[in-house]
UniProtKB/Swiss-Prot annotation:
One of its GO terms (cellular component) is plasma membrane. The chain crosses the membrane at residues 22-42, 94-114, 130-150, 164-184, 199-219, 254-274, 294-314, 333-353. It comes from Vesicomyosocius okutanii subsp. Calyptogena okutanii (strain HA). It is an enzyme of class 7 (translocase). Its EC number is 7.1.1.-. NDH-1 is composed of 14 different subunits. Subunits NuoA, H, J, K, L, M, N constitute the membrane sector of the complex. GO terms for molecular function: NADH dehydrogenase activity; oxidoreductase activity, acting on NAD(P)H, quinone or similar compound as acceptor; quinone binding. It catalyses: a quinone + NADH + 5 H(+)(in) = a quinol + NAD(+) + 4 H(+)(out). The keyword Transmembrane helix applies. This is NADH-quinone oxidoreductase subunit H. Keywords: Cell inner membrane, Cell membrane, Membrane, NAD, Quinone, Translocase, Transmembrane, Transmembrane helix, Ubiquinone. PROSITE patterns: COMPLEX1_ND1_2 (PS00668). InterPro entries: NADH_UbQ_OxRdtase_su1/FPO, NADH_UbQ_OxRdtase_su1_CS. The gene is nuoH. It is found in: Cell inner membrane.
Length: 357
């Protein structure tokens, strides 16, 4: 909160004629821009990292032509997509066709408003920030469903139907998985959940909730349409799914939304199960002092990078699951395990097993 108060004072000093409400709106707007620009850069270079990592896993070099070692490849890709023509299918509903990418990208950006990067670095600190993330994050699928419907083509429609079914299935699993975290932390505030895990790696929730952490990670792959669960846009089955009729910047917007959601799920995994911005060496006498100079945000970024690498590793090593296998995994495997683990956590809470309860 000290950083927030300092920021407020700076704005009032620069523009003293602003009243309190306008100043707060201006501050939130500035913080939103400060978050949006780095997020788009991270998304752009995550695509570069993906191509490089998967290339090395397949004994290839990956992008290496544009700029030194291919570092300018994301910029070249962006310019290419910006200059491509946007083609509208003959029988498409043009208004809904253009609205769909907006519905996909808007929630993917809006949900970052409540994500804390450190104890005092966030846009807003909602008491119900976890519920906000679940509510806003689930809206993005309507963009995919609308894209499938508005394209007036059979392959996008099949992709939209799959997307709707997967949303219903895995939103329930993710919701039940996060209930266990809320039961231990006693709050739905993301900041409070992270603070409850301070004290070192032994206090992090991935230890008592290890099966739930695995389920959450796999479910996040499904929710973000990532391989091996990318049946919504399976090229070998439905050509490209909901994206097949999109081109140029309309396609790029869907692309940005998918990768922004991937980064979001990686950050959520860190916040929920791996102590957020806390160092793993807290309360360890010698190591705590050695690593005390590293800011909390750096720890958060390092843990998030690890999960983002896991996304790439899974994509490069596992074949695509069939649609019926994914549904079976949700309803007959993950859902029963999460329900059972809720009762296990309730029992451990009553027994007050230290150090988590």
């Amino acid at each position: 909160m000290e950083l927030w108060q300092t920021f407020v004072k700076m704005v009032h000093a620069l523009v003293p004629w602003l009243d309190g409400t306008v100043a707060i709106i201006l501050i939130i707007f500035i913080k939103a821009i400060a978050l949006l620009i780095p997020l788009m850069l991270v998304v752009a270079y995550f695509t570069y990292a993906e191509r490089k990592v998967i290339g090395y896993m397949q004994l290839r070099i990956g992008p290496n032509r544009v700029g030194p070692k291919g570092w300018l490849q994301p910029i070249a890709d962006a310019l290419k997509l910006m200059t491509k023509e946007i083609i509208f299918p003959t029988k498409a509903n043009i208004y809904l066709f253009l609205l769909a990418p907006v519905l996909a990208i808007a929630p993917a950006i809006a949900v970052w408003a409540v994500i804390p990067f450190d104890e005092s670095i966030y846009i807003t600190n909602l008491d119900i920030s976890l519920l906000y993330v679940l509510a806003i994050g689930s809206i993005g699928v309507y963009g995919i469903i609308l894209a499938g419907w508005a394209s007036n083509s059979k392959y996008p429609l099949l992709g939209a139907l799959r997307s709707a079914a997967l949303l219903v299935s895995y939103e329930i699993v993710i919701g039940f998985a996060l209930v266990t975290v809320v039961m231990i932390a006693g709050s739905v505030n993301l900041n409070t959940i992270v603070q409850a895990q301070q004290g070192g790696i032994i206090y992090w929730y991935f230890i008592p909730l290890f099966p739930i952490m695995i389920i959450f990670f796999i479910s996040s792959l499904v929710e973000t349409n990532r391989a091996p669960f990318d049946v919504v846009e399976g090229e070998s089955e439905i050509v490209g799914g909901t994206h097949v009729e999109y081109s140029g910047m309309t396609f790029a917007v869907f692309f940005l939304a998918e990768y922004a959601n991937m980064i979001l799920m990686a950050v959520l995994s860190v916040i929920m199960f791996f102590g957020g911005w806390h160092s793993p060496f807290e309360a360890i006498p010698y190591l705590e002092s050695v690593f005390s100079w590293i800011p909390g945000m750096i720890w958060l970024l390092a843990k998030t990078t690890f999960f983002m690498f896991l996304y790439l590793w899974v994509r490069a090593t596992f074949p695509r699951f069939r649609y019926d296998q994914i549904m079976h995994l949700s309803w007959k495997v993950f859902l029963p395990i999460t329900i059972i683990w809720i009762f296990v956590v309730a029992l451990m809470t009553q027994l007050q097993l230290s150090p988590w309860f």
